[in-house]
């Protein structure tokens, strides 16, 4: 009986006191639409015109952008809800040191959303950051026809 109690206590100590290691999320595939690729090209055209390097599209970042768009569609709120989880995901999966997110809603064209980003000082500052090298984009349309945009830029 004493050995059974010792065994149970030992198992508890190994199981109950083991460290929780973080689980690295899977890297998800994503296929960019023509509209999304056009928006990435507009971002890169702006950057090269201003002496900055192109941002490389990454499928996993696009997937996270698409997930965020679905959240914005479901809540009808354009914002950065749960941005911290996207930051943590990209740090663990992509080794991102810095993560920035741009969101927009209800613009009819990529050119109009780019103009809005460039007219907003904070968004423009993000687009102008030299140390960024990767991008993900999603453009989603709600059942009511409203467009939602998420761009995530990392280094």
Question: Positions of the model-derived regions?
Answer:
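C-terminal motif of bacterial Sec signal peptides marking the signal peptidase cleavage site
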Residues: 13-16
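Loop/turn elements at helix/coil->beta-strand transitions in domains of secreted/extracellular proteins
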Residues: 48, 97-99, 132-133, 147
